[in-house]
From Swiss-Prot:
Known function: Lipase that displays broad substrate specificity and preferentially hydrolyzes p-nitrophenyl myristate in vitro. Also shows significant activity with pNP-butyrate (68%), pNP-octanoate (82%), pNP-decanoate (90%), and pNP-laurate (74%). Is probably involved in lipid catabolism. Is active at low pH, and might play some important role in mycobacterial biology in macrophages where the bacteria encounters acidic stress.
Protein's organism: Mycobacterium tuberculosis (strain ATCC 25618 / H37Rv)
pH effects: Optimum pH is 8.0. Retains nearly 60% enzyme activity at pH 6.0. The relative stability of purified enzyme is high at acidic pH and neutral pH (4.0-7.0) as compared to its relative stability at higher pH (9.0-10.0).
Regulation: Is inhibited by tetrahydrolipstatin, a specific lipase inhibitor and RHC 80267, a diacylglycerol lipase inhibitor, but not by phenylglyoxal and iodoacetate.
Gene Ontology biological process terms in this record: cellular response to acidic pH; fatty acid catabolic process
EC number of the protein: 3.1.1.1
Entry-linked PROSITE patterns: LIPASE_SER
Lineage: Bacteria, Bacillati, Actinomycetota, Actinomycetes, Mycobacteriales
Temperature sensitivity of activity: Optimum temperature is 50 degrees Celsius.
Induction data: Expression is early up-regulated during acidic stress as compared to normal whereas no expression is observed under nutrient and oxidative stress conditions.
Record's protein name: Lipase LipV
């Protein structure tokens, strides 16, 4: 079964040249600021399953998202595209490259969350289930501003709340996501590494101030062994929210992988 994703388009009309894949709990419009730095590039920015305005029905797996993204590219692409994945989106991007190498011209992996320690995942999920929502928007904003979004400009954080924070039936506030789906996706992040095919041009951006770190030495060694000269590692001085904290630099990386057309 192929599921249609809600897709935000940026840039001129026409076949997508870039596919962006967001992280767990996020949405396609999170790429809005980055897209402003690539105004002439047609970009497809979907909400993943269980996120935003895409369907919330199960299954909630990497494989289900890969199938939906492949169908999206079959409909909105015209040949291989540069696939940009942040965090969980980086894991999905690697699986997409392995499953449909004909659709992937290059990978840009922004602090990808791949093969995380299972105990760490359990702690994150326990905390998420213990405190799944917020008293008011101010509490939601404070959590992000003192966490992974600490080095993101305040107006960008404000736009995130305007788009993604919603009032819940219980009178509290939460993100526009399916909580059961998030539990499943965090579990998916503990899966073994799935590498892109040999010859896949790949840039991995490591957020050096992400704590705890998402990018492991195991992942870097595996990519380097598989891809050799086709693998590039860049270190950015920022926290985990790389596309929001460093949009100019990320846009330059994407341009370097696009090439002429």
């Amino acid at each position: 079964m192929i599921i249609d994703l809600h897709v935000q388009r940026y840039g001129p009309s026409g076949p997508a040249r870039v596919l962006t894949i967001h992280g767990v709990t996020e949405h396609g419009r999170i790429w809005h600021r980055l897209a402003h730095h690539l105004p002439e590039i047609p970009i497809a920015a979907p909400d993943l399953l269980g996120h935003g305005r895409s369907p919330w029905a199960a299954p909630w797996t990497i494989d289900a998202n890969v199938s939906a993204l492949a169908a999206l590219l079959d409909n909105q692409g015209d040949g291989p595209v540069v696939v940009v994945g942040h965090s969980f989106g980086g894991a999905v991007a690697m699986h997409l490259a392995a499953a449909r190498p004909d659709q992937v011209a290059a990978l840009v992996l922004l602090d990808p969350a791949v093969a995380l320690d299972g105990s760490r995942v359990r702690e994150v999920v326990d905390a998420m289930l213990a405190s799944p929502d917020y008293l008011d928007p101010a509490e939601a904003r404070a959590e992000k501003a003192t966490g992974a979004w600490a080095d993101v400009d305040p107006p960008v954080l404000d736009a995130e709340l305007d788009e993604h924070l919603v009032a819940l039936p219980n009178g509290r506030y939460g993100w526009r996501i399916s909580l059961p789906a998030m539990v499943c996706y965090w579990s998916e992040l503990a899966r073994d590494i799935v590498l892109p095919p040999v010859g896949t041009a790949t840039t991995l951006v490591r957020a050096v101030r992400a704590s705890p770190a998402y990018v492991s030495d195991q992942l870097l060694a595996a990519l380097d062994k598989r891809l050799g000269a086709d693998f590039e590692l860049l270190d950015f001085d920022c926290g985990h929210m790389v596309p929001q904290a460093k949009p100019t630099e990320v846009a330059a990386v994407i341009r370097s992988r696009l090439g002429p057309r």
